[in-house]
Amino acid sequence: MELYQAYTDYHGMMDLTENLYRYIAKEVTGSEILTYGEHTMDLSKPFERITMVDAVKKYANIDFNEVPDTAAAKKLAEEHHIEYEERHEKGDILNLFFEEYVEEHLIQPTFVMDHPIEISPLTKMKPEDPNYVERFEFF
């Protein structure tokens, strides 16, 4: 799903998305608790909001804030047997670590925020760190 709203930021869009999913679940199923396969998802609780860097740190125990540059990121990828292309920069490699180590763990509703600029070059940069952008994905 993709949606836009004027006069808000990405935090406001996350709020809107969270409320929309909660409302739809309640209207369609009569509950904010959903079962999918062997998993139960609880939409009644606040959805987790985590940065991509923090998610990789949580599930891969690697802090990309401590990775100084692209060369170090590529070395780290090699050590973890993560394939990358020569053109990839540090942010691209962060995204590869996210795909390898994090995605499978995101069962409960989660917003992954603050993606690297390399994978979202047209998105508004974070004022406090232009290496990241004000973007989120809902899992």
Residue ranges, per PLM feature:
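Short, glycine/acidic-rich hinge or "gate" loops at secondary-structure transitions
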Residues: 28-40
